[in-house]
Design a protein with these regions (language model features):
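A sensor for short, sequence-defined functional sites
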Residues: 1-182
Length: 182
């Protein structure tokens, strides 16, 4: 059984997704008037996710300089969150989603697929460079590049409410990093 909530004020929400601002609230759902099968119900579809898939392939040289490519797929609510920013331009998208979360990374190019097909994942291909951090003879880097998981949401010393992310989430990360011998 599917629940459809149509919101004409948000042009990026497809009909198969409950708009995010009413997700997990209550609404008057009318199923069958003849059988009195209607009433106030929680607007929730556990099958629809905030879904990110990130594939990173990168090489790191002896000086700790990383060059690589990433393919990123944003589906369902993840796509929905990013579309308004993408419509403002690729540079604004890079400034919003890549630069603040991945400090030190330079995005050399960004290409986007399925921008106008709301039933398909928003796919991006990114070429990037980064100077890895170092301490003495060791170079280190985060494998969570472009995933949305760069910063830990649980590091606050004092929390004043329960953690509720607003929708079910699924993150898939694949990484292949080549490092110099030795």
């Amino acid at each position: 059984k599917h629940v459809y909530v149509l919101d004409a004020t948000n042009k990026y929400t497809p009909a198969n997704l409950i708009p995010y601002d009413v997700l997990y609230t209550e609404g008057l759902v009318i199923e069958k008037l003849s059988s009195s099968d209607w009433g106030w119900k929680t607007l929730w579809n556990e099958e629809k996710l905030f879904q990110n898939t990130t594939i990173v392939i990168a090489d790191i040289n002896e000086n700790g300089f990383m060059t690589g490519e990433a393919s990123i797929g944003y589906a369902e609510y993840s796509r929905l969150e990013r579309m308004p920013v993408l419509k403002k331009g690729k540079q604004k998208f890079i400034e919003t989603y890549f630069n603040p979360k991945n400090s030190g990374i330079t995005v050399d190019s960004l290409s986007v697929e399925n921008e106008d097909a709301d039933s398909l994942p928003l796919n991006q291909h990114v070429k990037f460079t980064e100077k890895t951090s170092s301490s003495g003879d060791y170079h280190y880097f985060s494998v969570n590049l472009f995933s949305g998981l760069e910063k830990n949401p649980f590091i606050a010393d004092n929390r004043f409410s329960d953690v509720f992310f607003g929708r079910n989430q699924k993150y898939v990360l694949h990484g292949k990093f080549s490092i110099p011998a030795g």
